[in-house]
Amino acid sequence: MKAKVLLVDDSALARRSVRQMLEADGYTVVEAEDGMTALERYFLEKPDLVLLDLVMKGMNGLDVLAKLRLMDPAVRVIVVSADVQHSSRELAHGAGASAFVIKPVSRPEILKAVANVLEVIS
């Protein structure tokens, strides 16, 4: 069985789209629609990887990433965002993101990013 992925995005449409891409490739997907739910699901589900939107209502992606790092310094996170600013990419990497993927994501792009990050830990 492939890895378990926690998918965090406040857009139900974005979650559904990425979920379908990942599940079609054999990944198990757990969803969270906001930062607090993401932290709870991470603690309960122990996913191998987190796909994290940067801009969300309430707690933003960088805040979620910081809290995840406190919970688990080895957490693997791919930031998935429509924010194409180079500074956003730098902030995400500086906060500990393993990769950064720009929305809208394509199936090959997201699967490659997930496989690359998971390969590093296997």
Functional labels for PLM-detected ranges:
Residues V105-V114:
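C-terminal output helix
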Residues K57-G58, Q85:
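The feature encodes the CheY-like receiver
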Residues R16-A24, E90:
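Charged docking surfaces used in two-component/phosphorelay signaling
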Residues G26-E33, R41:
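Short hydrophobic/Thr-rich beta-strand motif most characteristic of the beta2 strand and flanking loop
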Residues D63, V84-A99, K112:
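Alpha4 helix (beta4-alpha4-beta5 surface) of REC/receiver domains from two-component response regulators
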Residues D34-T37, N60-D63:
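Acidic catalytic/metal-coordinating carboxylates
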Residues V50, L54-V55:
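The short loop immediately C-terminal to the conserved phospho-acceptor aspartate in CheY-like receiver
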